[in-house]
């Protein structure tokens, strides 16, 4: 429920604060005082596009701030609203209320705030649109649109779950159809790609490269290319360390020399020399190890150049792969892994195509059944809704009016991308909201031809149709009880007894909802629980909002009664109208 609204520098309103209660609140005022700015402010809180031209002349920005409570709402609605607050980081005030604010800058971007936290306008509307239902003359025009008519019928029918199930199946069906078409169109391309991948993997598997093999080959080839030089260097070094095989010269080797030196030092009684003997012994150990390693190195060296030729041939094989698939062998192996994964995804078999065709057919059947189920729900609800709206119109001084709702299957051409064959044999167009075309019909006098609402209702008649529809939706609990319903001059083009009946219907609606109405009709204003008047407060044309007392209400109603003003007859007429309305039992 909206408990307070503060407007600053919006249109004709300089600064105004209005407090709202449960029940029926009416706003009146002379033309040009800014009554509609109150509704405009609520539209802004509902996420409407910010218009800098709405900022009052001389001001830098306009601000609209609303305070909402959720105590009168059902648990499910409160839980949904709390989820919006939590996701936005918004907080409630100490009394549990929530402040929503919209700021419009003359030169910069607009700002939105919810519970003290800056939020996108979409997040703000996600909260306020659950609490506010706004209706104006533009909304009457929207009621002529087929999608709005279908939406109203679905609300009455409580068709939300059926619509969601249909949409889920439709998305799956469209995805499967796209996959099937893509599969058929790309079958040859996929087969060619699979052949290329198989050829490449076979080539790689035949060569059988090992991780890092190309790097190791470079080192091996470099070593084998200098085989004679390496053998000579190793042989010379070994001979120098251990001596030549000639027994007469064997004592010239480093091993023998170090052995003799160590023995000489060990034979001494001098401690220093014996310490040096240990160092020479360590050197001897190192030299002996080096001699052994040089021997092993020489044993491993190929006896001829055939080993080099084998390494070069292997390098040529690997280079064939690195020229085609990657810069090095490790990259080739990664490419092969990716190719195997891709090949596993490429199902080019006839079995795969047939399975996809079966799945698409199954989804089409399920979707067709869901569409029929949704149509059945709508057709049943259409009869009840049309009957109840016609009854409301009768109570609004339109006893001969007839309101109808047509629900027909929207047929499709064979070339339509969303054509769906139904069990009945019809080829329907599977739109986002079903296969149904919903059309509201209206005739002011029974016996005449019923025409589409857009072609048959005048402004005043359209106002009453819309009000009747809202009353039916609200009283059948398709609108959450405790929410706020705002009507901006939907009584345009209406007067007399019809205006009285509109007032009565709005008062009845206020039993379960907070109802706020901007009106120029005294018959409607007389039924309100609270009467607010928008009036000019200064010479600069600024306007404010004032709550009227009982006597003030009489004076305002007298003004609204054809400008009778402060005349005795005007006041008497206004007082009688007010007393009659307030004492109406609203049966």
Curated annotation (Swiss-Prot):
One Pfam family it belongs to: SMC_N
Give the UniProt keywords, A-Z.
ATP-binding, DNA damage, DNA repair, Nucleotide-binding
| Matching InterPro entries | DNA_recomb/repair_RecN (IPR004604), P-loop_NTPase (IPR027417), RecF/RecN/SMC_N (IPR003395)
Q: Which GO CC terms are listed, alphabetically? A: bacterial nucleoid; peptidoglycan-based cell wall
* Gene name of the encoded protein: recN
- SUPFAM superfamilies per record: P-loop containing nucleoside triphosphate hydrolases (SSF52540)
UniProt function note = May be involved in recombinational repair of damaged DNA.
A molecular function annotated in GO for this UniProt entry is: ATP binding
User: GO terms for biological process?
Assistant: DNA recombination; DNA repair; SOS response
Which residues are listed for ATP binding in this entry? 29-36
- Protein name stated in the entry: DNA repair protein RecN
Asked if the record carries the keyword Zinc-finger, the reply is: no
Task: Report the sequence similarity comment from the record.
Answer: Belongs to the RecN family.
Highest taxon of the source? Bacteria
- Decide whether keyword Protein transport is in the record: no
């Amino acid at each position: 429920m909206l408990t307070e609204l503060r407007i600053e520098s919006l249109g004709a309103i300089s600064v105004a604060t209005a407090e709202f209660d449960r029940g029926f609140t009416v706003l009146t005022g002379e033309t040009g005082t800014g009554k509609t700015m109150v509704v405009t402010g609520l539209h802004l809180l509902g996420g409407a596009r910010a218009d800098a031209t709405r900022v009052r002349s001389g001001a830098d920005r306009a601000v609209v701030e609303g305070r909402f409570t959720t105590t009168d709402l059902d648990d499910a609605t409160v839980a949904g609203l709390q989820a919006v607050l939590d996701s936005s980081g918004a907080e409630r005030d100490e009394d549990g209320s929530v402040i929503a604010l919209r700021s419009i800058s003359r030169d910069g971007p607009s700002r939105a705030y919810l519970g003290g936290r800056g939020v996108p306008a979409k997040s703000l509307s996600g909260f306020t649109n659950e609490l506010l239902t706004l209706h104006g003359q533009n909304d009457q025009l929207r009621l002529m649109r087929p999608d709005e008519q279908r939406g109203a019928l679905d609300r009455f029918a409580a068709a939300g779950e059926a619509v969601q199930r249909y949409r889920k199946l439709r998305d799956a069906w469209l995805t499967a159809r796209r996959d099937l078409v893509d599969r058929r169109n790309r079958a040859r391309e996929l087969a060619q790609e699979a052949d290329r991948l198989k050829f490449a993997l076979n080539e790689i598997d035949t060569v059988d490269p090992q991780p890092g093999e190309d790097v190791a080959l470079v080192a091996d080839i470099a070593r084998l290319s200098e085989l004679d030089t390496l053998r000579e260097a190793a042989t010379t070094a070994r001979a120098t360390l251990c001596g030549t095989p000639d027994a007469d010269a064997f004592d010239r080797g480093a091993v023998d020399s170090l052995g003799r030196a160590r023995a000489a030092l060990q034979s001494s009684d001098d401690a220093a020399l014996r310490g040096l003997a240990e160092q020479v012994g360590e050197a001897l150990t190192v030299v002996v190890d080096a001699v052994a390693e040089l021997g092993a190195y020489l044993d491993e060296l190929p006896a001829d150049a055939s080993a080099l030729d084998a390494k070069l041939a292997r390098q040529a094989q690997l280079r064939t792969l690195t020229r085609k698939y990657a810069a090095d062998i490790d990259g080739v192996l990664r490419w092969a892994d990716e190719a195997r994964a891709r090949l596993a995804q490429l199902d080019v078999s006839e079995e795969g195509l047939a399975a996809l065709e079966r799945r698409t057919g199954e989804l089409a059947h399920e979707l067709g059944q869901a569409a029929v189920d949704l149509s059945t729900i709508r057709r049943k609800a259409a009869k009840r809704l049309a009957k109840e709206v016609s009854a409301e119109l009768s109570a609004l001084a339109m006893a001969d009016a007839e309101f109808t709702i047509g629900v027909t299957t929207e047929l499709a051409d064979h070339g339509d991308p969303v054509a769906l064959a139904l069990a009945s044999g019809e080829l329907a167009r599977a739109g986002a909201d079903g296969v149904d075309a919903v059309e509201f019909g209206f005739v002011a006098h029974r016996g005449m031809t019923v025409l589409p609402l857009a072609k048959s209702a005048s402004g005043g008649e359209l106002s009453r149709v819309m009000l009747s529809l809202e009353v039916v939706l609200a009283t059948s609990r398709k609108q959450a009880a405790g929410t706020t319903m705002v009507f901006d001059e939907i009584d345009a083009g209406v007067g007399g007894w019809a205006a009285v009946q509109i007032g009565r219907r709005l008062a009845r609606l206020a039993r379960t909802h907070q109802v706020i109405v901007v009106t120029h009709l005294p018959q409607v204003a007389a039924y309100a629980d609270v009467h607010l008047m928008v009036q000019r407060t200064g010479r600069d044309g600024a306007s404010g909002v004032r709550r009227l007392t009982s006597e003030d209400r009489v004076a305002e109603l007298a003004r609204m009664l054809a400008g009778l003003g402060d005349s005795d007859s005007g006041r008497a007429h206004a007082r009688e109208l007010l007393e009659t309305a307030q004492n109406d039992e609203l049966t």
